[in-house]
Amino acid sequence: MKYLFINVTAGAGSTGKLVEKACRERMAQGHECRIAYGREAKNCQGIPLLPIGTPGDCRRHALMHRIHGTGGFGSKAATARFLEQVKAYDPDIIWLHNLHGYYINIGLLFGYLRTCGKKIIWTLHDCWAFTGNCPYFTYVGCDRWRTGCGDCPQLDKYPQTRRDATKENFARKKELFTGIPNLSLQVPSKWLADLVSQSFLKDYPLSLVPNTVDPAVFHPTKSDLAAQYHLEHKFVVLGVANIWEPRKGLQDFISLSARLPDSCRVVLIGIPRKLQKKLPKNILALPRTKNQQELAQWYTLADVYVSPSVEETFGMTVLEAACCGTTPIVYQNTACQEVAQAHGGICAARGPEHLAEAILSLQKEAGK
């Protein structure tokens, strides 16, 4: 079988790593595979890649969205060229992942998908496919996606725009994304499956396929990090994010650090250098790790992993930490709860005071 994966990145970021992993698994089974990507590719040695457009195409698409609010409808020439490559490759299965990110024209793409006769799988990693613009909405309490969007409360959030075209975009996406023959959906959590079942995508076959991690990477891993950062006698509370946007809970970590005794140390990974200087001194703020092996070392070192995110469609870092032997603490009513419960974690009520209570209970049990 010939597979074509389409994602904003290849081997980079959370979705890019998942696509790379899925591609390698099928190549190991003897299938022919390619990854088409828009913005970044790394760690894809041995995988044939199809770049969609150029960095300049992405920048122009992003600028168009900032001004007009029509993200997903730029990159016409780049997408037209890409679709000619798709026809030449002639895949048996087209596997869509994240289509937002200013790299592909969804009008041209779904015009092709509607008539190509191929088997199509679409793995949803967020809610963008059934909204007028945003990938997440529950943390701001928005239900406009149920009735067609418009009057958007998140124009200043990714994907940021000056013009509210969400009602128009919603209608265009609904027309494009529905009624595609041979298309099935996959989601990583019951939480996201429930939302999809209430959206205009509800008529497609839907499978629950939880994300997985590489056990060769994420397992208990010894290191000298404790000595390097003087954490030998501390109860380490770890948080990790690729981008510390508001929904990830950075403010809750700041409040949490003030509630913990000196015997605890909060360590946050993924903090930009400019932001590191602004955080309280009792937080050890570090940039992104050099590689996944170093990240596994941090997970292993930690006494507890905390994810105060208020909206996730899965929670990869929660799973990674658990696979390294560290107890996760998450907020209730997000997909992270599903991951934590499956690995003996704690699901706390929302608020730093509840996180502190759970952490101090674990510290007491550990006698540390």
Please name every model-derived segment.
Residues 194-197, 213-228, 277:
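Acidic anion/phosphate-binding donor-loop and adjacent secondary structure
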